[in-house]
Amino acid sequence: KSRDGLLSLFSAFLSLLLVAALAAVIGFSLAQQKLRAPGPLASDKLLYFPARTDVPEILSKLESDGVIDAPLLMNLALWLEGNRGNVKAGEYLFKKDASLRDVMDMLVAGRVYLHALTIPEGLTSEQILQRLRENDVLAGDLREAPKEGLLLPETYRVPRGMSRSDLIRKMQDDQRRLVDQIWAKRDPSIPLRTPHELVTLASIVEKETGR
């Protein structure tokens, strides 16, 4: 009888384990389905999370703005995948019907929305700086303008909150690379001794043609 009792107890224990395992499998499957199912967002939405916005605040805003409808599940998935600390602040464009997985992947990868900022040819350095100061996507102050010809006129794609000084540095780096490429392919018969002379000449020509 004692042995029969132990067998019954062991059988009951195995049954409980089986039920628990089955429930876990079903729960995991349902959670995965929910993570990949189309979300509640009825149309594309642009949301901005300032620097140092924590995960609970991000989840709360995503829910209140109708991007997600299961913040607890998303929080749990981020934690289980070790990505809770990898969520990045910034401005994001969430697409219509974006799933929880879509939203998570975007936030973890930091795929922020980029704004187009066009700097046309013919502007002086001071005019370029004035355009950057007037652009409300950028942040931070600018002091004196760089020398003429050091900023590349181009269409730049910038994230909200990018510092104006960082963009100036990028414009200078891009211009330097372009000048180096042109200098390497220049006609040796042209009487220019340095890349700086090339930039100076280009600036003069640009000013004259822009009048």
Region roles according to the model:
Residues K1-R211:
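Conserved catalytic or metal-liganding residues and their short signature motifs at active sites
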